[in-house]
Amino acid sequence: MSAPTICPVCPHHCRLAPGETGICQARTNRKGYIVPSGYGVLASMALDPIEKKPLARFMPGSNILSIGFYGCNMRCPFCQNYTISQRAPKQNARRVSPREVLADAAEFKRTRGNIGVAYTYNEPLTNYEYVRDTAHLIHEAGMVNVLVTNG
């Protein structure tokens, strides 16, 4: 059996044997590489007021497309999103590509005044590859990216 691989994504530095998943439920050791457990598996997607992020002074009165993933590297007893943040991605769940998020964001921009995408509801950086890929497309389309993070 291979030696455990240390996950570099958060301060927990989980030591994962092949096939094991970290405390966040979002990172897995596959053949010695730490990879996302569910790239593109969204737990939630909704158009929210920017103030809900909570950003009271950043483009007040605007809407933003909020997306969230499964898993989180913290165990906050007061978490309002506990049901999604403390679960592993559903293996049979539909995957949403970054281009599909861009299409939804652009449609909401046209019809509802959307300003971009907020990565929220859990710790988005446990899925940093998806955030990176999506944020690049959103930025190129002239919209904003907002990270609601615990770090």
Per-range role (PLM):
Residues 29-151:
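Conserved Radical SAM active-site core
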Residues 5-27, 70-82:
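Local cysteine-cluster metal-coordination motifs and their immediate loop/turn environment
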